[in-house]
Amino acid sequence: VNGCLTMLHLLKNTKNSVLLNTCSIAGLVPAPGISVYGATKFAVRGLTESLRIEFERYNIRVSEINPWFTDTPILEAKQVSDNMESPWDKDFVNERTKIDPVEQVANAVWNSYTNKRIHNPLGFEGKFASFFMNLCPSLIRFLSKRMFKDTFLN
């Protein structure tokens, strides 16, 4: 939030400005086992929606990219904190779905300048999940529950 507002002056004075937020598919579809992470990404989605309307009067386009699981250091984490193990490490994710290369995110950032959509899910899985979450949310909740059933807290 602070970064977006801090950059507003610069964006207002730059022709064809684009403010791009990095969200996550976890902000569009349920992510059991990482509820707080999903909630923060859902907040980024809400911020993006609101800023898109607010900044439109300055001719600043606001959008976001929504990566699927991406091969970054976050998947290497075995611990979320000193006393909590990460339920979503690379091995866990690899057993359930495809992990996208980081280059896919870099390309999406580059392409976002000409892409006019507000939400930009990446990869086949991300686009599939996002599409069906809008079309049939109960299906995605069912699939998410089955796919990640062993991440629920006991």
Language-model-detected regions and their locations in the chain:
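Active-site helix of classical SDR
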Residues: 4, 40
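Alpha-helical segment proximal to the catalytic Tyr-Lys
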Residues: 9, 53-56
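Conserved catalytic-site region of short-chain dehydrogenase/reductase
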Residues: 27-29
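Active-site loop immediately N-terminal to the catalytic Tyr-X3-Lys motif
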Residues: 31-35
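Catalytic tyrosine of NAD(P)H-dependent dehydrogenase/reductases that use a Tyr as the general acid/base
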Residues: 37, 45
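A transmembrane-helix-recognition feature enriched in membrane-embedded lipid enzymes
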Residues: 116-151
